[in-house]
Amino acid sequence: MGRQKELMNRCGEMLHIRYRLLRQALAECLGTLILVMFGCGSVAQVVLSRGTHGGFLTINLAFGFAVTLAILVAGQVSGAHLNPAVTFAMCFLAREPWIKLPIYTLAQTLGAFLGAGIVFGLYYDAIWAFAGNELVVSGPNGTAGIFATYPSGHLDMVNGFFDQFIGTAALIVCVLAIVDPYNNPVPRGLEAFTVGLVVLVIGTSMGFNSGYAVNPARDFGPRLFTALAGWGSEVFTTGQNWWWVPIVSPLLGSIGGVFVYQLMIGCHLEQPPPSTEAENVKLAHMKHKEQI
């Protein structure tokens, strides 16, 4: 037992990454992988069973709890943004350095890509059998929607853009309230569960139009995977070239959420003098102003 523990400690020392930003990027990658693996896995179960093994509520529950678990896994290392829109908002508020935006975004997109790959491997036989050994993007036998979001038939581009903007703005407003130490603070340790509840509420109230991506990495990573895995370029052209909406609109929505929260809440809170220069407003009790 003692020798095994010593060996494990040595391996841990050898594998330890000293560059903090790289450690944080790895945590974002794993956290987003967990989010997509559980979230898209629930969609796969519903779609491939044609509704006999779940439904709209189970999908939203899975995504909500997936966010909670991802924050618990990655939060202490990176803050568990899991979403370029969240990272963008934090950088815009000067709570994170701008260098983190491209690095976190790349890590989150890679994690989403890998999470989609795991779901594809897990349901490989079922996906191929679903449409008679074909990979169909849309329609009654479509399976690309397991991985990325697509607009409903009634939805036009303008309404879809607004849908993603409002969903992301709502997410950011709630996240900022949760991590704001001067507002009603969430009890220590419950931040992850509260953010998961926010995602669940957004899904059950705003998921009908286009599946509430509200996360560029969660949508683009799996979409890119499906393009490479056999669904082809149609995943980008379907829905009047819908693919760019879940990327651009959430980023704009994140800024909208920042302005709404700051103008209506954040700027008016009584703020006692901070004990340190750092702001303790991360989802997992980490300091925002860190040395990279």
From Swiss-Prot:
Coiled coil: none annotated. Residues 1-24, 75-78, 93-100, 178-189, 265-292 are cytoplasmic. The record marks 63, 212, 218 as: Selectivity filter. It catalyses: glycerol(in) = glycerol(out); H2O(in) = H2O(out); urea(in) = urea(out); H2O2(out) = H2O2(in). Keywords: Cell membrane, Glycoprotein, Membrane, Repeat, Transmembrane, Transmembrane helix, Transport. Channel activity is inhibited by mercury ions. GO terms for molecular function: glycerol channel activity; identical protein binding; polyol transmembrane transporter activity; water channel activity. Signal peptide: none annotated. A motif (NPA 2) lies at residues 215-217. Aquaporins contain two tandem repeats each containing three membrane-spanning domains and a pore-forming loop with the signature motif Asn-Pro-Ala (NPA). It holds the Pfam family MIP. Belongs to the MIP/aquaporin (TC 1.A.8) family. The keyword Glycoprotein applies. Detected in kidney medulla and papilla, in collecting duct cells. Detected in colon. Disulfide bonds: none annotated. The keyword Repeat applies. The lineage of its organism: Eukaryota, Metazoa, Chordata, Craniata, Vertebrata. Residues 43-56, 122-159, 207-210, 225-242 are extracellular. It is found in: Cell membrane; Basolateral cell membrane. Residues 79-92, 211-224 dip into the membrane without crossing it. This is Aquaporin-3. A motif (NPA 1) lies at residues 83-85. GO terms for cellular component: basolateral plasma membrane; cell-cell junction; cytoplasm; plasma membrane. Aquaglyceroporins form homotetrameric transmembrane channels, with each monomer independently mediating glycerol and water transport across the plasma membrane along their osmotic gradient. Could also be permeable to urea. Also participates in cell permeability to H2O2 and H2O2-mediated signaling. In skin, transports glycerol to the epidermis and stratum corneum, where it maintains hydration, elasticity, and supports lipid biosynthesis for barrier repair. In kidney, contributes to the reabsorption of water, helping the body maintain proper fluid balance. It is a multi-pass membrane protein.
